[in-house]
Structures are given as structure tokens and as C-alpha cells.
Amino acid sequence: MCCLPVFVILLLLIASAPSVDALPKTKDDMSLASFHDNAKRTLQILSNKRYCCVYDYSCCLSWG
């Protein structure tokens, strides 16, 4: 039972610890929204290429 107060104090300290979001941003940091937009754009390009190549092979040649 004497360990219970120590355990509770540790839980409170862990909960109040600063998170990763509290770190200051630098000029090299990229926002997560921008990262998701780039990923979405890349997936759209790849899916368009896959669709194009299935139905028209000459279209694939224009992709490089």
C-alpha cells in the first residue's frame, strides 16, 4: 500500500509531461496537412497512370 502514492504521483507526472507538439517549429518542419496533401497527390497520379496503362498502352509511354 505504500507504493500506491508513488504510483499515483508518477502517473500525474507522465500525464503532465510536454508532448511532441510542444516542441518549437523550425524552418525545416513541414506541416502534417502538407505531407498528407503530397501523399494524396502522389497516389492520384499513380492511380491515373495505372488506369491509363490498363486501357491504353500508348498512354503509358508518355509517363516517361
From Swiss-Prot:
**Which Pfam families does the record associate with it?**
Chi-conotoxin
Q: Tell me which UniProt keywords the record has, alphabetically.
A: Amidation, Cleavage on pair of basic residues, Disulfide bond, Secreted, Signal, Toxin
Q: InterPro entries per the record?
A: T-conotoxin
* Expression (tissue specificity): Expressed by the venom duct.
Primary location recorded for the protein, binned into one broad class: secreted
User: What GO molecular function terms would the record report?
Assistant: toxin activity
- Give the domain note: The cysteine framework is V (CC-CC).
The protein in question is named Conotoxin Pn-B01121
